[in-house]
Amino acid sequence: MFKIKKVDAHCDIPCAVYDPAVAQFAALSVVRFLDLIGEMDDSLSSKEDIAHLSRIMEQKESHAKEVKDAVATIWGDYFKEPHMEKFPEIHSLTHSIMMTASKCKQSLDRENGLKLVELVNRFAEIFWTTKEVQVESKKSLNPPNL
């Protein structure tokens, strides 16, 4: 009857199931991938090394995109006018996250990854504050231990 091949989307019901932890994990992963790339020998002397670098690069870019997707969904679907009045920075913060995630895809500069984690953590802080949840910063037990 229907010939639907593939559908990808956040539910848009709206389901009210939002959590910036996805973006936080992905941003932390971007830094980890940048670190793994930095630990590699510059010579890339074997096909195995080239394949390994290619896999890490693909994951770095995929996780940077995941940050963008998760943040865009929360920003676009969750944040409403009262939130924006209380946190007018949310628009510029979201834009900065998008731009910084793109920089992470385009370069190997670890500072971009660190900035992405910082921005996403601020986004998460605002999100949870709108839900009246007390927020505290913790270091990840996983590398890169940020």
What is each stretch, according to the model?
Residues 46, 53-71:
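Alpha-helical segments in soluble extracytoplasmic regions
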Residues 1-54, 83, 88-122, 126-146:
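N-terminal intrinsically disordered, cationic/polar leader segments
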Residues 70-87:
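Short, solvent-exposed, charged loop/turn and helix-capping segments
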